[in-house]
A protein has these predicted regions:
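Noncatalytic alpha-helical scaffold of FAD-dependent oxidoreductases
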Residues: 1-172
Length: 172
């Protein structure tokens, strides 16, 4: 609980992992937390051990972000009810490199999974980042959440400290 600040670490074991050849970032709109959890299960079934992140961002997050982050570019045309930021890793060079048709297999697979999710009405909109700059832009919005909330609270006369980072236990 004290993260090593009150004791001496005498031994440690490290498990090293191969760096991914590619990380695909996508942003989707789910209508509810329930649909977002179903979405996570669909992605886990197609990409076991490859989901690097799955971040839920409700509509209030986007409203606060729009009010407090300069030059914010929303990932979708309208403010999502429940935004989900997903990173999927690819460890295979074949998955991350264009094939004969010029398609990147991991991206094609993500598109197919998204199509299934649309058909199941789990999502209402989605976008896949085309480059690292788009991915960094989305992540910078997510990472600015605490500062955005602080600015919003300073504008109001509400309590002066409000932070949240919600984790949902994932059942195996």
């Amino acid at each position: 609980g004290a993260e090593g600040t009150l004791g001496i670490i005498t031994a440690a074991t490290l498990k090293l992992f191969q760096l991914p050849k590619m990380i695909s970032t996508l942003f989707v709109e789910a209508d509810s937390i329930s649909n977002a959890i179903k979405l996570l299960n669909v992605f886990k079934s197609y990409f076991p051990d490859r989901i690097e992140s799955f971040e839920l961002m409700p509509k209030v997050f986007w409203e606060v972000a729009k009010n407090n982050i300069e030059k914010i570019i929303l990932p979708l045309e309208k403010t999502p009810e429940m935004g989900v930021l997903i990173d999927i890793s690819s460890y295979s060079k074949d998955d991350a490199s264009p094939n004969e048709e010029g398609e990147i297999p991991i991206i094609k697979k993500i598109e197919n999974v998204l199509e299934e999710c649309f058909e199941k009405n789990l999502i209402s909109d989605a976008t896949i980042c085309k480059n690292e700059n788009q991915s960094k832009s989305l992540w910078s919005i997510r990472e600015a959440a605490a500062e955005s909330e602080k600015k919003e609270l300073e504008k109001s006369n509400l309590i002066k400290c409000l932070k949240h980072d919600i984790s949902i236990p994932v059942e195996s």
